[in-house]
UniProtKB/Swiss-Prot annotation:
GO terms for cellular component: cytosol. Pathway: Amino-acid biosynthesis; L-homocysteine biosynthesis; L-homocysteine from S-adenosyl-L-homocysteine: step 1/1. This is Adenosylhomocysteinase. It catalyses: S-adenosyl-L-homocysteine + H2O = L-homocysteine + adenosine. It comes from Methylobacterium nodulans (strain LMG 21967 / CNCM I-2342 / ORS 2060). Pfam families: AdoHcyase (PF05221), AdoHcyase_NAD (PF00670). Its EC number is 3.13.2.1.
Length: 468
């Protein structure tokens, strides 16, 4: 059992506030609550020790308590230095679940907390990872690589964050007995990954033959990527910009870099707020989609002096460069809704004059006197400056996460060290669990109709290659 103080939160006194909001969120998360009812008696996660690295929000608290209700033992950190909701972390800590998460952590604290995920409270090790962005997974892979003798990369960090991360790995190698990372890698039975960026890392490891354990790509479940990424961003992006700046959105020109699911939701969010929206894309298919939706598709170079608001949603690096920001209007708003902070060249701004306006809102002045307003230092604006996606859409994502954890834990040995997705039948089940809450009446196929299109009356209703 965890000790009484096996947590780090800003203020444990916020637990009651957090508990009240968790109770409200539960009524908006029908998928997770249905999973609790279905599986509580059978305890499919009994024996699972889940190391969770995912934004420590109110919605995540409902996920954590669902995993616990299904029998799991849990330790948790946030996957972003600004995304923690302190009252949510306090409520989870007060419930006896070890959590290490504070809004506004330093990068050093962030990685120290990540290391605590793997120092289990019974002296053992976790045997499952639930990840968002892949940092917990990378901790195991980088540590084992260095432990096996290939440690040269630790002396070649490519960023401030890598410098801190690699220093942590070096410290762990000194503090832990030889073979600790090997034992950790062997202990982990699988990982379920939440987001596009983390999934990209997993597929890269798998292609190189370096993935240490089976992985389920939760992001590409239809009920995650086509709902959380699209409809979640449609609501939460503008919320973050408004809370950060109080700016009038209507009439402004907004530039969205990237028109994947997150970019589509972001562009819709800005359009619905009255913005005139520009989009940049490298993919001709996505560019054509944006144009057919009525957006002007152009380049960042063209948009830099024109737009009032800039949003990156690409999953790539250096999308907004220092030169782009030099060309922007005075007090243009710059933010990111992709997982990592390197979509905007924030490092190139460090030698300029910074004025902090309020938490996660900075004004940066260039040599010519013009300024930009940077939100959340280029990290996730919807979680850094607001409260993230609404509970209902996160219920679908987190129901997928729970089902993925059950699948990996209860079917050890079934999966190779590759990346898998959940079957379509489970995707449809997740969707079905959310229909009653919003008053949907589903049509039932007759036997002759099902036979005519070659499907079962009860689904799956689409082939695996179908694109929603």
């Amino acid at each position: 059992m965890p000790s009484a103080q096996d947590y780090i939160v800003r203020d444990i006194g916020l637990a009651d506030f957090g508990r009240k909001e968790i109770a409200i969120a539960e009524t908006e998360m029908p998928g997770l609550m249905a999973v609790r009812r279905e599986y509580a008696a059978s305890q499919p996660l009994k024996g699972a020790k889940i190391a969770g690295s995912l934004h420590m929000t109110i919605q995540t608290a409902v996920l954590i308590e669902t995993l616990k209700a299904l029998g799991a033992d849990i330790r948790w950190v946030s996957c972003n230095i600004y995304s923690t909701q302190d009252h949510a972390a306090a409520a989870i800590a007060a419930a006896g679940i070890p959590v290490f998460a504070v809004k506004g952590e330093t990068l050093t604290e962030y990685w120290d907390y990540t290391a605590k995920l793997f120092e289990w409270h019974d002296g053992g090790m976790p045997n499952m990872i639930l990840d968002d962005g892949g940092d917990a997974t990378m901790f195991v892979h980088a540590g084992l690589r260095a432990e096996r003798g290939d440690a040269v990369f630790l002396d070649k960090p490519g960023s401030e964050e890598e410098e801190i991360f690699f220093a942590l790995i070096k410290r762990m190698l000194k503090e832990k007995p030889q073979g600790w990372f090997a034992g950790l890698a062997e202990s982990i039975k699988g990982v379920s990954e939440e987001t596009t960026t983390g999934v990209h890392r997993l597929y890269l490891l798998a292609r190189e033959g370096k993935l240490l354990f089976p992985a389920i790509n939760v992001n590409d479940s239809v009920t995650k990527s086509k709902f959380d990424n699209l409809y979640g961003c449609r609501e939460s992006l503008v919320d973050g910009i408004r809370r950060g700046t109080d700016v009038m959105m209507a009439g402004k020109v907004a530039m969205v870099a990237g028109f994947g699911d997150v970019g589509k939701g972001s562009a819709a969010s800005l359009r619905n707020a009255g913005c005139r929206v520009l989009v940049s894309e490298v993919d001709p298919i996505c560019a054509l989609q944006a144009a057919m939706e009525g957006y002007e598709v152009t380049t960042m170079e063209d948009a830099a002096p024109r737009a009032d608001i800039f949003v990156t949603a690409t999953g790539n690096k250096d999308v907004i460069t220092l030169d782009h920001m030099r060309a922007m209007k005075d007090r243009a708003i710059v933010c990111n809704i992709g997982h990592f902070d390197n979509e905007i060249q924030v490092a190139g701004l460090r030698n300029l004059k910074w004025t902090n306006i309020k938490p996660q809102v900075d004004e940066i002045e260039f040599a010519d006197g013009h300024r930009i307003i940077l939100l959340s230092e280029g990290r996730l604006v919807n979680l850094g400056n607001a409260m993230g996606h609404p509970s209902f859409v996160m219920s679908a994502s987190f129901t997928n996460q729970t089902l993925a954890q059950i699948e990996l834990w209860t079917n050890q040995g079934k999966y190779d060290r590759q990346v898998y997705t959940l079957p379509k039948a489970l995707d449809e089940k997740v969707a079905a669990l959310h229909l009653e809450k919003i008053g949907v009446k589903l049509t039932k196929l007759r036997p002759d109709q099902a036979a005519y299109i070659g499907v079962s009356e009860n689904g799956p209703f689409k082939p695996d290659h179908y694109r929603y």
